Amino acid sequence: MSAKTDEILESLKSLSLLEASELVKQIEEAFGVSAAASAGVVMAAPGAAGGGGEAAEEKTEFDVILEGFEASAKIKVLKAVREATGLGLGDAKALVEAAPKAFKEGVSKEDAEAAKKAIEEAGGKVTLK
């Protein structure tokens, strides 16, 4: 590898998980690609190599994705998103209008389920990944 690629690799190794996640989002936006397909392949490989025991391991981090909402429930969904995320009105409105969109990432199962319940009670459709 060249010195430039070695330097980039070392920089990537020093990123926190949150910073790496933000970098992936920026790359997806800048190049118009999605990292979701390749991530699925990477996740499938360790389970296949490790045998059947690891494949049954329960997921510990979830992304909460607002898939959509009933038009009549937009304000209720907006309020529920604000409560779940702590976002301001403008940011929450932009997030709700951009559905489908993840509004919580890398959260525990309990937090994900609580957010899902609150949004669904307000009239939104939510999935956990």
Curated annotation (Swiss-Prot):
Alphabetized UniProt keyword annotations: Ribonucleoprotein, Ribosomal protein
GO annotation, biological process: translation
InterPro entries: Ribosomal_bL12, Ribosomal_bL12_C, Ribosomal_bL12_C/ClpS-like, Ribosomal_bL12_oligo, Ribosomal_bL12_oligo_N_sf
Signal peptide range: none
Gene3D superfamilies per the UniProt record, alphabetical: 3.30.1390.10, Single helix bin
Iron-sulfur recorded as keyword: no
Domain of life: Bacteria
Pfam families hit by this protein: Ribosomal_L12, Ribosomal_L12_N
GO-annotated cellular components: cytosolic large ribosomal subunit
Keyword Ribonucleoprotein: yes
An MF annotation (GO) of this entry: mRNA binding
Function: Forms part of the ribosomal stalk which helps the ribosome interact with GTP-bound translation factors. Is thus essential for accurate translation.
Assembly mode: Homodimer. Part of the ribosomal stalk of the 50S ribosomal subunit. Forms a multimeric L10(L12)X complex, where L10 forms an elongated spine to which 2 to 4 L12 dimers bind in a sequential fashion. Binds GTP-bound translation factors.
NCBIfam families: L12
Protein family (similarity comment): Belongs to the bacterial ribosomal protein bL12 family.
Protein name: Large ribosomal subunit protein bL12
Species per Swiss-Prot/TrEMBL record: Synechococcus sp. (strain CC9605)
Gene name tied to this protein: rplL
